């Protein structure tokens, strides 16, 4: 059989034309150096700030990614997200053209994930239908709505003196071991049945502490509406830095669809330290306390994303699917101070960004006053307009009483003969202080909190011994639950006290007090 050269060339040509090879043009670079999770790459001329870079996979085939953070004249400085031991000089790095994205949606509820949204709770894969970028522009002024709906924490001292509204940013600040996490966890537990999705972001915490928090949430049934994002102390600084933005994106999913969400950042001091570590390794110039110049922007761009958005924004975002509903993302950032120094760099930054702060004091905590809230310097700038009517009406004098009591108590130590008015004020202050104590993981509903505040306002506790104040409150709650359940339901639904309810409550407390020994 003789082969014709013309036929052969035609055959080859047709084969080449029929070959379906897609050209994939991607910018590639070479690893120049790897140190402490920071990689310097040469040749990525088209890399964007914050772009994901693709590195060679690990030994078991897991893909490796990094974030381009430093764009220099002849190289790119990137941080590796995860393991970096397998990366060496000369490896090929590719641009992806994408910003870092994490899975979002209701599929994440009840799960514990890492900073990249990957499950770490051993409950199998998360089949999320959507992903979203971790860095987003916060809603503008026109898209926002004023904060006027309460976000009840269930803690008497906070809901009465430092009320928080949906869409507010309220800082929880204090030294280590003053109960900051406990306040935030109580707030999450109290959202049961309130149509609120919660996100708890643990940054730089011990793995055992995160496990304890997850266990507490499971026991309270709070994991049914909570997502836990964990970047423990053993993870890289890059993962700790990214985790807060990942959690925020997961919370924004619900806000943008006309739902309410609560996010706790525990804590932003450790995130700032992680960012400082990354910045110094990238050879960025250090500023005050060795933090980089953009550490304020680090927190402001995160916390500005917590907001209450109006119905027009939600309707436009969902393309008309959700109408007439506002959405909110409430943030409770936590900051750890050193020896009560709130004038340090990161605490002052976050205080100026947020809408108020709850200041927890070591002295109060050690004296058994828990939550250890300092009423004098704790403030909520927008929460009072969101406070429920019943609590607002009954808590007016409590803050003033407490602040004056602390002031008078300091002077009373040196004075032996006090006038009657001062003695009365000291007695009342001591009872209010005792009454605001609350056990951990036991938030109160509005009706029972209202009953407690009503009893103290009307002087039912003025003649009780201080050590009997909390037993009286506990007994009163049990009595009202068993004998006056309808009244509690009425207060819970109306969130206000009318004259009939007030008269019934007075009669109930009087009746209980007679039987209280």
From Swiss-Prot:
Record-marked site positions (Required for activity): 378
Purpose of the protein: Produces ATP from ADP in the presence of a proton gradient across the membrane. The alpha chain is a regulatory subunit.
Family: Belongs to the ATPase alpha/beta chains family.
Subcellular location as annotated: Cell inner membrane
Gene3D superfamilies linked: 2.40.30.20, ATP synthase alpha/beta chain, C-terminal domain, P-loop containing nucleotide triphosphate hydrolases
UniProt organism field: Variovorax paradoxus (strain S110)
Cellular component terms (Gene Ontology): plasma membrane; proton-transporting ATP synthase complex
Annotated keywords: ATP synthesis, ATP-binding, Cell inner membrane, Cell membrane, CF(1), Hydrogen ion transport, Ion transport, Membrane, Nucleotide-binding, Translocase, Transport
EC number: 7.1.2.2
Subunit annotation: F-type ATPases have 2 components, CF(1) - the catalytic core - and CF(0) - the membrane proton channel. CF(1) has five subunits: alpha(3), beta(3), gamma(1), delta(1), epsilon(1). CF(0) has three main subunits: a(1), b(2) and c(9-12). The alpha and beta chains form an alternating ring which encloses part of the gamma chain. CF(1) is attached to CF(0) by a central stalk formed by the gamma and epsilon chains, while a peripheral stalk is formed by the delta and b chains.
Any GO MF annotation of the entry: ATP binding
Catalytic reaction(s) noted: ATP + H2O + 4 H(+)(in) = ADP + phosphate + 5 H(+)(out)
Pfam families with a match to the protein in the record: ATP-synt_ab, ATP-synt_ab_C, ATP-synt_ab_N
Residues engaged in binding ATP: 174-181
Membrane-protein topology: Peripheral membrane protein
Gene (UniProt): atpA
Root EC class: translocase
InterPro entries, sorted: ATP_synth_asu-like_sf (IPR023366), ATP_synth_asu_C (IPR000793), ATP_synth_asu_C_sf (IPR038376), ATP_synth_F1_a_nt-bd_dom (IPR033732), ATP_synth_F1_asu (IPR005294), ATPase_a/bsu_AS (IPR020003), ATPase_F1/V1/A1_a/bsu_N (IPR004100), ATPase_F1/V1/A1_a/bsu_N_sf (IPR036121)
Entry keyword annotation includes ATP-binding: yes
PROSITE patterns for the chain: ATPASE_ALPHA_BETA
Protein name as it appears in the record: ATP synthase subunit alpha
């Amino acid at each position: 059989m003789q082969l014709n050269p013309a036929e052969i060339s035609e055959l080859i040509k047709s084969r080449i034309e029929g070959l379906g090879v897609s050209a994939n043009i991607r910018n590639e670079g070479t690893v120049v150096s790897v140190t402490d999770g920071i990689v310097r790459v040469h040749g990525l001329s088209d890399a964007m700030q914050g772009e994901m870079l693709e590195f060679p996979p690990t030994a078991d085939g897991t893909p490796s990614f990094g974030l381009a953070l430093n764009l220099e004249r002849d190289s790119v400085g990137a941080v590796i997200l995860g393991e970096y031991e397998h990366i060496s000089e000369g490896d090929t790095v590719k641009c992806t053209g994408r910003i870092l994205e994490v899975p979002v949606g209701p599929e994440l509820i009840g799960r514990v994930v890492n900073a990249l949204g990957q499950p770490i709770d051993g409950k199998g894969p998360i089949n999320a239908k959507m992903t979203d970028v971790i860095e987003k522009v916060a809603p503008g002024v026109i898209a926002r709505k004023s904060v006027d709906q309460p976000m009840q924490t269930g803690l008497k001292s906070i809901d009465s003196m430092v009320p928080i509204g949906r869409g507010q940013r309220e800082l929880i600040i204090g030294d280590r071991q003053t109960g900051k996490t406990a306040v935030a966890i109580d707030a999450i537990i109290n959202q049961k049945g309130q149509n609120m999705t919660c996100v708890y972001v643990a940054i730089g915490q011990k793995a055992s502490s995160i496990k304890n928090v997850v266990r507490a949430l499971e026991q309270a049934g709070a994991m049914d509406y909570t997502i836990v994002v964990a970047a423990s102390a053993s993870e890289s600084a890059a993962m700790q830095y990214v985790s807060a933005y990942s959690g925020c994106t997961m919370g924004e999913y619900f806000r943008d669809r006309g739902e309410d969400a609560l996010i706790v950042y525990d804590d932003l001091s450790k995130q700032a330290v992680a960012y400082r570590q990354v910045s110094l390794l990238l050879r960025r110039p250090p500023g005050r306390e060795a933090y980089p110049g953009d550490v304020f922007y680090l927190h402001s761009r995160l916390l500005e994303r917590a907001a209450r958005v109006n119905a027009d924004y939600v309707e436009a975002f969902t393309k008309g699917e959700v109408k007439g509903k506002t959405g909110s993302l409430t943030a409770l950032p936590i900051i750890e101070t050193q020896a009560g120094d709130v004038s340090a760099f990161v605490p002052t930054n976050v205080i100026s960004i947020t809408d108020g702060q709850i200041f927890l004091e070591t002295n109060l905590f050690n004296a058994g006053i828990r939550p250890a809230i300092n009423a004098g310097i704790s403030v909520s700038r927008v929460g009072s307009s969101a406070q429920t009517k019943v609590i607002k009406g009954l808590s007016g004098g409590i803050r003033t009483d407490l602040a004056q009591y602390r002031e008078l108590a300091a002077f009373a130590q040196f004075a032996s003969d006090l006038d009657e008015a001062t003695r009365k004020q000291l007695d009342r202050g001591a009872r209010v202080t005792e009454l605001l104590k609350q056990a951990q993981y036991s938030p109160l509903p509005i009706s029972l909190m209202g009953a407690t505040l009503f009893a103290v306002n009307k002087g039912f506790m003025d003649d009780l011994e201080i050590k009997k104040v909390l037993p009286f409150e506990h007994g009163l709650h049990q009595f009202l639950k068993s004998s006056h359940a309808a009244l509690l339901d009425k207060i819970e639904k109306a969130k206000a006290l009318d004259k009939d309810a007030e008269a019934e409550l007075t009669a109930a407390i009087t009746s209980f007090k007679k039987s209280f020994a």
